[in-house]
Amino acid sequence: MTKFVRKYMFCLVLVFAACSLVVNSIRTPPLKNTVNGGEKKNADIEQAQTHHKKEISKNGGVEMEMYPTGSSLPDCSYACGACSPCKRVMISFECSVAESCSVIYRCTCRGRYYHVPSRA
């Protein structure tokens, strides 16, 4: 009986580990932003994608998708729910000249502020 339970638990752990690996390895390409100057951002993304394709054809190696690193402006496309137009606004705080002021982005629609969704 305990042998069966051990095998069952081992199979269960193995299935969960495999599912975890699959979920963590799936990545989606960056979204094209159309809010607040999205045309320029779309052109930058497309240029980076075509540059990457040229690199692959030159090197003739294994294709790997590249994702931008570092900070980027938040996307408010889905932050406001059904309310539209949802726009990104910058909120800054008064601070002394010696220190740097933090900048916070919020999504706003019809006078209401919504939390900016994080990219995970």
From Swiss-Prot:
What function is annotated for this protein? Controls stomatal patterning. Regulates the number of cells that enter, and remain in, the stomatal lineage by inhibiting protodermal cells from adopting the meristemoid mother cell (MMC) fate in a non-cell-autonomous manner. Mediates stomatal development inhibition. MEPF2: mobile signal controlling stomatal development in a non-cell-autonomous manner. Uses ERECTA as major receptor. Inactivated by cleavage by CRSP (AC Q9LNU1). May act by competing with somatogen (AC Q9SV72) for the same receptor, TMM (AC Q9SSD1).
Q: Name one GO cellular component term.
A: extracellular region
Q: What happens when the gene is disrupted?
A: Increased small pavement cell (non-stomatal) and stomatal cell density. Inversion in CO(2) control of stomatal development resulting in an increased number of stomata at elevated CO(2) concentration.
Organ and tissue specificity: Expressed in leaves, especially by the MMCs and their early descendants cells (stomatal lineage cells) including guard mother cells (GMCs).
- What is the protein's quaternary organization? Interacts with ERECTA, ERL1 and TMM.
| Free-text domain note | The loop (92-105) connecting the two anti-parallel beta-strands (85-91 and 106-112) confers the function to the peptide.
Listed Pfam families: EPF (PF17181)
Top-level taxon of the source organism: Eukaryota
Protein known as: Protein EPIDERMAL PATTERNING FACTOR 2
Alphabetic keyword roster:
Developmental protein, Disulfide bond, Secreted, Signal
Instruction: Check the UniProt entry and state the signal peptide residues, or none.
Output: 1-25
- Keyword Secreted present in the record's keywords: the answer is yes
Citing just one GO molecular function, the answer is: protein kinase binding
Task: Give the organism, scientific name.
Answer: Arabidopsis thaliana
Q: Which GO terms describe its biological process?
A: guard cell differentiation; negative regulation of stomatal complex development; plant epidermis morphogenesis; stomatal complex development
The family assignment reads: Belongs to the plant cysteine rich small secretory peptide family. Epidermal patterning factor subfamily.
Question: Listed disulfide bonds for this chain?
Answer: 76-107, 80-86, 83-109, 95-101
- What induces this protein's gene, according to its Swiss-Prot or TrEMBL record? Induced by high CO(2).
Q: Where in the cell is it found?
A: Secreted
